[in-house]
Swiss-Prot record:
Protein name per its UniProtKB record: Blood group Rh(D) polypeptide
Function: May be part of an oligomeric complex which is likely to have a transport or channel function in the erythrocyte membrane.
Recorded consequence of changing residue 233 to Q: Found in RhDVa(FK), RhDVa(TO), RhDVa(TT) and RhDYo
Species this chain originates from: Homo sapiens (Human)
Effect of mutating residue 276 to P: May be associated with low RHD expression, resulting in a weak D phenotype
Reported impact of residue 238 to M: Found in RhDVa(TO) and RhDVa(TT)
Keywords: Blood group antigen, Cell membrane, Lipoprotein, Membrane, Palmitate, Transmembrane, Transmembrane helix
Resulting phenotype, residue 223 to V: Found in RhDVa(FK) and RhDVa(TT); may be associated with low RHD expression, resulting in a weak D phenotype
A molecular-function term among this protein's GO annotations: ammonium channel activity
Short name of any one Pfam family annotated for the protein: Ammonium_transp
Gene assigned in the entry: RHD
Length: 417
């Protein structure tokens, strides 16, 4: 029988992370410079505010949303911040190398930082499926692979399907969900006997998770409109996202009560379902012509989210062996697909209204983009899962899953950590 004491990452993590950080610093030194153009001051302030909203969503929103586990709340918040900081640095370089490098050095603007923050958000969504089962050294690998895969996916979609920044980034919901679930499928499945309660939620951590959901709820309109260039499209995106998430809150709380035999509300369902409308309208938020359509979509998304959170995890756990703790991954996979379908429907209606006869071609392109995003997510996720299983990363023992004591110093608690 193997030892249940946690494997130390003292040799692995500092060497791996600091060497990588030194390499990133050298790359920034040799290949980047700031934008020297004189931007309009008003536009500069507005651009910074959007970037600030995205950072709040990532650091506070998603950080606290994943902190509901009874004994893994500290690690959830801190590891999310670690991944965000590393992911933004690598995403800035990667996007620059893929799009600007042939012309010389990579020019860093507020827009490129905004784009990098959104790319790093993909990792924070995916990691919900594996948090508690991996250490920081493994998460560094996951950040590098996922940001690289998403960056290349966006470049391929942009070049082949001729899409703008908003459209190729809005595949992030589907991509992140399937990437995270495929990584989780590769990791050891069940918790050892006697430790099954470790992945359960507790009252105080659940309150922190609700705080994260509130931050995401407030700033989701900024996320869906961040990359749109047209002022009219940005306005439509903000309005439609706001109406959709407002309705999904009402639906989430009501649907959660309906799903319980005694009419009680589940904290776990509400945490993710209140965001359902924002995910569902993400791809088509700038195309929806009327608020009532966004509200209907928010209602449907809220119901799907509650139903999916109740029934889908148990089904997937039995069939695929994916742990039931990744409710956000299940929801984003369903709601991302719903959003893509709504976008295709609206695109067809818009094409018919404009008298354009290439409806089939437009639908084929949209299906091709979605299929490519899912395939790359699954393939890169499986590759990441295989890499994370290598012994070099000193993965925590299964008996120490979902345990802050493996990673944090608590002088007043038991020895042996």
């Amino acid at each position: 029988m193997s030892s249940k004491y946690p494997r130390s990452v003292r040799r692995c993590l500092p060497l791996w992370a600091l060497t990588l950080e030194a390499a990133l610093i050298l790359l920034f030194y040799f290949f980047t410079h700031y934008d020297a153009s004189l931007e309009d001051q008003k536009g500069l302030v507005a651009s910074y505010q959007v970037g600030q909203d995205l950072t709040v969503m990532a650091a506070i929103g998603l950080g606290f949303l994943t902190s509901s586990f009874r004994r893994h709340s500290w690690s959830s918040v801190a590891f999310n911040l670690f991944m965000l900081a590393l992911g933004v640095q690598w995403a800035i370089l990667l996007d620059g190398f893929l799009s600007q490098f042939p012309s010389g050095k990579v020019v860093i603007t507020l827009f490129s930082i905004r784009l990098a923050t959104m790319s790093a958000l993909s990792v924070l969504i995916s990691v919900d499926a594996v948090l508690g089962k991996v250490n920081l050294a493994q998460l560094v690998v996951m950040v590098l692979v996922e940001v690289t895969a998403l960056g290349n996916l966006r470049m391929v979609i942009s070049n082949i399907f001729n899409t703008d920044y908003h459209m190729n980034m809005m595949h992030i919901y589907v991509f992140a969900a399937y990437f995270g679930l495929s990584v989780a499928w590769c990791l050891p499945k069940p918790l050892p006997e006697g430790t099954e309660d470790k992945d359960q939620t507790a009252t105080i951590p659940s309150l922190s998770a609700m705080l994260g959901a509130l931050f995401l709820w407030m700033f989701w309109p900024s996320f869906n409109s961040a990359l749109l260039r047209s002022p009219i499209e940005r306005k439509n995106a903000v309005f439609n996202t706001y109406y959709a998430v407002a309705v999904s809150v009402v639906t989430a709380i009501s649907g959660s009560s309906l799903a319980h035999p005694q009419g009680k509300i589940s904290k776990t369902y509400v945490h993710s379902a209140v965001l359902a409308g924002g995910v569902a309208v993400g791809t088509s938020c700038h195309l929806i012509p009327s608020p009532w359509l966004a509200m209907v979509l928010g209602l449907v998304a809220g119901l799907i989210s509650v139903g999916g959170a109740k029934y889908l995890p148990g089904c997937c756990n039995r069939v695929l062996g994916i742990p039931h703790s990744s409710i956000m991954g299940y929801n984003f996979s369903l709601l991302g697909l719903l959003g893509e379908i709504i976008y295709i429907v609206l695109l067809v209606l818009d094409t018919v209204g404009a008298g354009n006869g290439m409806i089939g071609f437009q639908v084929l392109l949209s299906i091709g983009e979605l299929s490519l995003a899912i395939v790359i997510a699954l393939m890169s996720g499986l590759l990441t899962g295989l890499l994370l299983n290598l012994k070099i990363w000193k993965a925590p023992h299964e008996a120490k899953y979902f345990d802050d004591q493996v990673f944090w110093k608590f002088p007043h608690l038991a020895v042996g950590f």
